[in-house]
Amino acid sequence: QCCPTMPECCRI
């Protein structure tokens, strides 16, 4: 899932 405050979380 993508984090609103951390868009890069989507890449992981």
UniProtKB/Swiss-Prot annotation:
Keywords: Amidation, Disulfide bond, Pyrrolidone carboxylic acid, Secreted, Toxin
Family that this chain belongs to: Belongs to the conotoxin T superfamily.
Coiled-coil residue windows: none
Modified residues (Isoleucine amide): I12
GO cellular component: extracellular region
Cystine pairings recorded for this chain: C2-C9, C3-C10
Protein name in UniProt: Conotoxin Vi1361
GO molecular function: toxin activity
Compartments it resides in: Secreted
Modified residue annotations for Pyrrolidone carboxylic acid: Q1
